[in-house]
């Protein structure tokens, strides 16, 4: 009992520390007592406002399952007000010079740097990942903001002078209007930062719906954007679940939707949003394979497999959840298990923690059930993390590193995205067999090959039907000057996130054919035939 009281007190202390730092905007420290918990605000037209909803969702610290806050399911009126604020702000923001919009983002990236550790602490409190991993979450999002500051180069149009005498042809990119983003729980800072900074620097206004499980980081990011000089109404934030998603998919004033999350939700949003005439980009699930050749650097490969499989407790869409050991590389399996055993499982804010808890008890149960299915279907559990107990955090959603071998492509633990600290291991005799396994899997988010042979690496990179390939790089998430190019069942849409494709998604082309005659003359008679542009 005493331990439980102490743990609860520690959680309250962390809430109050974070609250005071962010001026009690959405976690008002003064309202926290033994009978109440902080409430997350809405952000509408430049103001953080308390929701009038009668439906609220508890936010839990995954390490303790202690309630640390409550987030509203926004009412229809509140969601309408948020879109209306976006719509009102759009004309002036779109007409704001591109240099002025760039200056807002330049100030914004500096404020994110200055507040990076505070954002990371909020992430760890609500999501559970280690503080170091949470800082990486913020940093990878910050890189996209920094890239968005290059908008003056990214939004260049095209020209073709003198297509005929006195006639020029040119195009430029224009914002769409009101855009919306629906973010997942696993990257509370990075994914929102993939969305609204890119959209807004192009001249759009933005409606953001963070995950109801981890809203705090997005709210702090909104405050920092406001402090950077973004006009009221250019970014608005609502909260909720299914009703909020349907609202975004159906609202006629929303022109484009960015989504990251599960396949079930992504397919639904893509179909419903597209049916309503919206652009939709949806990053979804994955089953990322790491193919290990026997000539690979053994030390580096084993360390990279362990880090990429179990970091963030496997709750990454780019987690390396499947290892394919080719030929003699299968002899490395015992050493792989020993390295995974050495990882330290603890609450994310504890020193030395390598991985924290899963997001919810339901997520833990699902992961454990998938491990069970492997054993029942004939696989071997070489390392079992199902019964791990973390001292002082016995109520947390912890699963330790788990390695399942003798896995076949027909097994449930292989076919489903586990989204937990579980590595499934398959074995093949040849590279061609490994390539077939990867290509037969429906997902196409990421893959990696570990080898010291350049010809093998090139063959693999060219033959696998996967959008992002790493060569001795286990998690090949592109830097933002490129784009996140997941494919097949991992993505729906025509245009990917950030980079050049991100600019294309959030803009539309306008093409202008202009004629200014050299002589000051007028037509002597109407031209009634089809223009041939001088040909």
From Swiss-Prot:
Residues bearing PTM N6-succinyllysine: 47, 52, 55, 76, 117, 129, 364, 376, 391, 517
Protein's UniProt keywords contain Oxidoreductase: yes
Catalytic reactions on record: 3-oxopropanoate + NAD(+) + CoA + H2O = hydrogencarbonate + acetyl-CoA + NADH + H(+); 2-methyl-3-oxopropanoate + NAD(+) + CoA + H2O = propanoyl-CoA + hydrogencarbonate + NADH + H(+); (R)-2-methyl-3-oxopropanoate + NAD(+) + CoA + H2O = propanoyl-CoA + hydrogencarbonate + NADH + H(+); (S)-2-methyl-3-oxopropanoate + NAD(+) + CoA + H2O = propanoyl-CoA + hydrogencarbonate + NADH + H(+)
One GO location term (cellular component): mitochondrion
Tissue-specificity statement: Expressed in the head and flagellum of epididymal sperm but not in testicular sperm (at protein level). Kidney > liver > heart > muscle > brain.
Modified residues (Phosphoserine): 262, 380
Record Gene3D superfamilies: Aldehyde Dehydrogenase, Chain A, domain 1, Aldehyde Dehydrogenase, Chain A, domain 2
N6-acetyllysine found at: 47, 52, 55, 76, 87, 117, 129, 298, 330-331, 364, 376, 500
UniProt keyword annotations, A-Z: Acetylation, Mitochondrion, NAD, Oxidoreductase, Phosphoprotein, Transit peptide
Transit peptide start and end: 1-32
GO biological process terms held by the UniProt record: beta-alanine catabolic process; brown fat cell differentiation; thymine catabolic process; thymine metabolic process; valine catabolic process; valine metabolic process
InterPro entries: Ald_DH/histidinol_DH (IPR016161), Ald_DH_C (IPR016163), Ald_DH_CS_CYS (IPR016160), Ald_DH_N (IPR016162), Aldehyde_DH_dom (IPR015590), MeMal-semiAld_DH (IPR010061)
Entry EC number(s): 1.2.1.27
Compartments, as annotated in UniProt: Mitochondrion
Active site feature: 317
pH dependence remark: Optimum pH is 8.
Binding positions for NAD(+) per the UniProt entry: 183, 185, 209, 212-213, 262, 417
Stored Pfam families: Aldedh
UniProt keyword annotation of Cell cycle present: no
MF terms in GO: malonate-semialdehyde dehydrogenase (acetylating) activity; methylmalonate-semialdehyde dehydrogenase (acylating, NAD) activity; thiolester hydrolase activity
Role according to the record: Malonate and methylmalonate semialdehyde dehydrogenase involved in the catabolism of valine, thymine, and compounds catabolized by way of beta-alanine, including uracil and cytidine.
Assigned protein family: Belongs to the aldehyde dehydrogenase family.
Subunit structure: Homotetramer.
Protein name, entry field: Methylmalonate-semialdehyde/malonate-semialdehyde dehydrogenase [acylating], mitochondrial
Organism encoding this protein: Rattus norvegicus
């Amino acid at each position: 009992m005493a331990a439980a009281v102490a743990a609860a007190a520690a959680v309250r202390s962390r809430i109050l520390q974070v609250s005071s730092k962010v001026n009690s905007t959405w976690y008002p420290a003064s309202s926290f007592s033994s009978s109440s918990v902080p409430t997350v605000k809405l952000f509408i037209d430049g103001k953080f406002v308390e929701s009038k909803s009668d439906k609220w969702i508890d936010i839990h610290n995954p390490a303790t399952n202690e309630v640390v806050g409550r987030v509203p399911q926004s009412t229809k009126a509140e969601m309408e007000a948020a879109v209306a604020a976006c719509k009102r702000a759009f004309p002036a923001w779109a007409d704001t010079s591109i240099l002025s919009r760039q200056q807002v983002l330049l100030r914004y990236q500096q404020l994110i740097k200055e507040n990076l550790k505070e954002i990371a602490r909020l992430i760890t409190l609500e999501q559970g990942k280690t503080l170091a991993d949470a800082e990486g979450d913020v940093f990878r999002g910050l890189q996209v903001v920094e890239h968005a500051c290059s908008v003056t180069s990214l939004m260049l149009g095209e020209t073709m002078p003198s297509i005929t005498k006195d006639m020029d042809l040119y195009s430029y990119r224009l914002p769409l209007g009101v855009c919306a983003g629906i973010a997942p729980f696993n990257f509370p800072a990075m994914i929102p930062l993939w969305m609204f900074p890119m959209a807004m620097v192009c001249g759009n206004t933005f409606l953001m719906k963070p995950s109801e499980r981890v809203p705090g980081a997005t709210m702090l990011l909104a405050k920092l954007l406001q402090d950077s000089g973004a006009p009221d109404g250019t970014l608005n934030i609502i909260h909720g679940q299914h009703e909020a998603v349907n609202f975004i998919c159906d609202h006629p004033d929303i022109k484009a939707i960015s989504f990251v999350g599960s396949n079930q939700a992504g397919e639904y949003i893509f179909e419903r949003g597209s049916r309503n005439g919206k652009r939709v980009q949806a990053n979804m699930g994955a089953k990322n394979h790491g193919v290990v050749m026997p000539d690979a650097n053994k030390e580096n490969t084993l360390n990279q497999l362990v880090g990429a499989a179990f970091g963030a407790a496997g709750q990454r869409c780019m987690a390396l959840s499947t290892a394919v050991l080719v030929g003699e590389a299968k002899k490395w399996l015992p050493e792989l298990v020993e390295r995974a055993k050495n990882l330290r499982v603890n609450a994310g804010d504890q020193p030395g923690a390598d991985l924290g808890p899963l997001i919810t008890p339901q997520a833990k149960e699902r992961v454990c059930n998938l491990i069970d299915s492997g054993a029942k279907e004939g696989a071997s559990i070489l390392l079992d993390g199902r019964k791990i107990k973390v001292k002082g955090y016995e109520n947390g959603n912890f699963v330790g590193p788990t390695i399942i071998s003798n896995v076949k492509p027909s097994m449930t633990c292989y076919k489903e995205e586990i989204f937990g600290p579980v590595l499934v291991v398959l074995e093949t005799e040849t590279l061609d067999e490994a390539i077939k396994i990867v290509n037969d899997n429906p997902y196409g988010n990421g893959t990696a090959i570990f080898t010291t042979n350049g010809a093998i690496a090139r063959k693999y990179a060219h033959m696998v039907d996967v959008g992002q390939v790493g060569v001795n790089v286990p998690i090949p998430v592109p830097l933002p000057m490129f784009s996140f190019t997941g494919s097949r069942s991992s993505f729906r849409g025509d245009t990917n996130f950030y980079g050049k494709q991100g600019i294309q998604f959030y803009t539309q082309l306008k093409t202008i054919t202009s004629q200014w005659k050299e002589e000051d003359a007028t037509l002597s008679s109407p031209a009634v035939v089809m223009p041939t542009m001088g040909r």
